[in-house]
């Protein structure tokens, strides 16, 4: 499957990215190469291979939750351009 400029524009729109024409060309080639590697993996014969979810045989490496000193709200918000009621105000990203 060949990645087109339209495919790159679609992905960029989903990611809310603005790309130049040069970047679109570059990313189309890079995405095409990456998907080519995925197609190679599809050719592998995996009959008789046990499915795995982890590369290392390790399960649930838990640690104790411990509180540690932090910077505090006032210091965290010190450089915030528009804090509101002790929180960061950020631009709306979902329409």
UniProtKB/Swiss-Prot annotation:
Cite the GO molecular-function annotations of the record: asparaginyl-tRNA synthase (glutamine-hydrolyzing) activity; ATP binding; glutaminyl-tRNA synthase (glutamine-hydrolyzing) activity
What is the E.C. number?
6.3.5.-
**Residues forming coiled coils:** none
* GO biological process assignments: glutaminyl-tRNAGln biosynthesis via transamidation; regulation of translational fidelity; translation
Which top-level group of life is the source organism from?
Bacteria
Which InterPro entries does this one have?
Asp/Glu-ADT_sf_sub_c, GatC
Q: What class of enzyme is it?
A: ligase
Quickly give the catalysed reaction. L-glutamyl-tRNA(Gln) + L-glutamine + ATP + H2O = L-glutaminyl-tRNA(Gln) + L-glutamate + ADP + phosphate + H(+); L-aspartyl-tRNA(Asn) + L-glutamine + ATP + H2O = L-asparaginyl-tRNA(Asn) + L-glutamate + ADP + phosphate + 2 H(+)
Listed A to Z, the keywords are: ATP-binding, Ligase, Nucleotide-binding, Protein biosynthesis
Q: Subunit structure of this entry?
A: Heterotrimer of A, B and C subunits.
Q: Which HAMAP family match?
A: GatC
Q: Family assignment?
A: Belongs to the GatC family.
Q: Report the function annotation for this chain.
A: Allows the formation of correctly charged Asn-tRNA(Asn) or Gln-tRNA(Gln) through the transamidation of misacylated Asp-tRNA(Asn) or Glu-tRNA(Gln) in organisms which lack either or both of asparaginyl-tRNA or glutaminyl-tRNA synthetases. The reaction takes place in the presence of glutamine and ATP through an activated phospho-Asp-tRNA(Asn) or phospho-Glu-tRNA(Gln).
The protein's matches in NCBIfam families, at most eight in alphabetical order, are given as:
gatC
This protein's name: Aspartyl/glutamyl-tRNA(Asn/Gln) amidotransferase subunit C
Q: Which organism is it from?
A: Pelobacter propionicus (strain DSM 2379 / NBRC 103807 / OttBd1)
The lineage, from the top, is:
Bacteria, Pseudomonadati, Thermodesulfobacteriota, Desulfuromonadia, Desulfuromonadales
């Amino acid at each position: 499957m060949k990645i087109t400029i339209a495919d790159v524009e679609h992905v960029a729109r989903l990611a809310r990215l603005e790309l130049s024409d040069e970047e679109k060309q570059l990313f189309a080639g890079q995405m095409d190469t990456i998907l080519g590697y995925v197609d190679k993996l599809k050719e592998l014969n995996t009959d008789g291979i046990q499915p795995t979810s982890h590369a290392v045989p390790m399960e649930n490496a838990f640690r104790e939750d411990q509180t540690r000193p932090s910077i505090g709200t006032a210091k965290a918000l010190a450089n915030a351009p528009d804090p509101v009621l002790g929180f960061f105000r950020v631009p709306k990203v979902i329409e």
